[in-house]
Every structure is written in structure tokens, then in C-alpha cells.
Amino acid sequence: MFKEFKIFIMRGNVVDLAVGIVIGAAFGAIVNSLVKDVLMPPIGLLLGNVDFGNLFIVLKEGAIGGPYESLLVAQTAGAVTINYGVFINALINFLILAMAIFFFVVRPLNQLAARQKSKEAVIPAQTDKKDCPYCATQIPLKASKCPYCTSELM
């Protein structure tokens, strides 16, 4: 049983998957920092000193009544909130990550597949058929008589 598990783990696709997950998590952290620390502060500044992480709607006040200065204060007070600013940050994270995956993974793979397909189209396919000169149907290359029109072939 342990031997089978070892064979399963050592297969290339399992190891590739593990490496992909680790790199994906690290890349996700980089994108998250890019959005939170680099992109959103200037956008918030342009929109009048708005911190997107602190955009929320209070549905029900907590033990300590509002208004709340920040999302953290509202959550500490036990208020029920809709955190649409955090959602905007997550949406921008997703869009950047999706664009990066598209431009660095999907698009190159599609181009590689298209090149491979064009190479296959250039190489003529080997065939074991020929056209009958009398009825123009496909017949075996070694045929001496057409099975369709019964003409003798040379």
C-alpha cells in the first residue's frame, strides 16, 4: 500500500500540481499586495481619500452603537456589515490574476497549439488510397481493378 502511494506521489503530474499550487499561492499574495498597497491607495486618493478596505454598510449595529470609523471598529463592536470595499479589492485581485494567467499561460499555450497544428497541416498525410481514373472514387493503392466501376487499372 505504501509502495503504491509512493508511486502515485512520484508521478510527474502530482508533483507538478503541488509546485503549481505553491507558486500560485505565492503569486496570489503578490497580486494581493499589488492591489492593496500599490493600486488602491492612488485610486482612493483620486476619489477623495477613500480607503476601499473601509467601505461598508451597517445592517445592524453592534453592542456599541455607530457610526463606526472603520470596518475594524464595526466588527469589534459586533456590527453586522456588508463589506463592499473588501469585495472591490478582491474583484480587482481576481481581474489582475485572470489577466496574468491569460497572458502568461493560456495565450502562449494556444499559440503553441496553433503552431503545432500548422506544422501538421504542412506535412502531407501518408495515404494508402488513390483515385480511380474512370469513376474518381477512392480505392486501395494496390488495387488492380476498381470495385465500383470494375475498370481494369494499370
UniProtKB/Swiss-Prot annotation:
Pfam families: MscL (PF01741). GO terms for cellular component: plasma membrane. The chain crosses the membrane at residues 14-34, 86-106. Gene3D superfamilies: Large-conductance mechanosensitive channel, MscL, domain 1. Keywords: Cell membrane, Ion channel, Ion transport, Membrane, Transmembrane, Transmembrane helix, Transport. It is found in: Cell membrane. Belongs to the MscL family. NCBIfam families: mscL. Homopentamer. Channel that opens in response to stretch forces in the membrane lipid bilayer. May participate in the regulation of osmotic pressure changes within the cell. This is Large-conductance mechanosensitive channel.
